[in-house]
Amino acid sequence: RDQPRSRGLGDVYKRQICHSFAEDGRCISLLKIMLTNYCIYDCAYCINRRSNDIPRATLSVSELVDLTIEFYRRNYIEGLFLSSGVVRNPDYTMERLVRVAKDLRLVHKFNGYIHLKSIPGASRELVNEAGLYADRLSVNIEIPKEENLKLLAPEKDHKSVYQPMRYIQQGVLTNKEDRKKFRHVPRFVPAGQSTQMIVGATTESDKDILYLSSSLYQHPTMRRVYYSGYISVNTYDKRLPALKQPPLVRENRLYQADWLLRFYQFKVEEIVDDSYPDLDLEIDPKLGWALRHPELFPIDINQADYEMILRVPGIGIKSARQIIASRRFSKLGFYELKKIGVVMKKAQYFITCNELPTRTVNELTPTGVRRLLVPKPKKKVDERQLILNFTDNE
């Protein structure tokens, strides 16, 4: 428990409470907790690997259920995010995870959100049972390429990950057909499934990662791929890169590219290719694409179709829809676009309208626009240097 004097307005009550966003934009507080940090696997990138000499603990099913209910009653949380290290075997661990969700739903009539981590290698029966009580199931791919997974986690393979993914997908599709025939059939994993990849622990390029993500999104039940910048926890293992800090900028760029794939109708080959296998860390992927294709710009904001407006840097989905709706009544200028929410600092170089000057990407060149939009690096000041500020008031 935190010391009372260290807690103030807005402090999270427990470190185990995390925040997730629902598809409708709501922020949900979740109790993020592990059943146990014991594990039979010795994955090089994991702090809970078998060979690590760290404190270990295991919660019983009843302890987890009681903890969740108490937090829920006190309005600390709106749901549970439950994962676990693998003890004994995948089925044994998965059975305990299912029991937690089952007891919450059936015994305590818990109607909050439940996200369960499905254990790779668990049986179809247990995955199907978990889907009856969980809102979302996830199976983590962890390392995008199997040869690199084998290098860092020799006891694992991608087959054990993709198999439960297929179980979940088949369960959702079967449930959808059953609900057409019978009204009272319980829903199966209504929030779909997700997965996660570790970024920076191995040699995969952003191109490799995004092509894998794109193929996963072809499956109707895959709602989200998460990217986690590698945190250097086992520095003694020579198979791992020596990173001073997690690649957070790269992680953010992957999320931006992922957003373009899911909502902006981009294809992977438009974002990364053989010439540009990694995302630019200085600019976002949409701006990067626009600067590589100056021949497509500028576009007339009062005439262009929705799909092309979406591709303009500084214009999001909501703004694009408002532009289409608003221009039916009058022509849009600088003031109207800014009021709609367009980031004119970026967009002005890629669009034309009545009031904008003609300093577009074609006049300034992509290099010139990039120079204007990339923030200048701040000069580092030697902390040992004494700085004297002289003002007229002294």
Positions of the model-derived regions?
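Single conserved hydrophobic/aromatic residue that forms the stacking wall/gate
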Residues: 2-9, 13
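Long, highly charged, low-complexity intrinsically disordered interaction regions
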Residues: 240-310, 346-377, 383-390
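Residue-level signature of tetratricopeptide-repeat
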Residues: 326-327
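Short, electropositive alpha-helical surface patch
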Residues: 94-102, 106, 131-140, 200-219, ...
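N-terminal pre-triad scaffold of radical SAM enzymes
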Residues: 17-47, 72, 79, 195
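Core AdoMet radical
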Residues: 49-64, 71-97, 103-124, 131-182, ...
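Conserved C-terminal portion of the radical SAM core fold
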Residues: 145, 160-237, 246-272
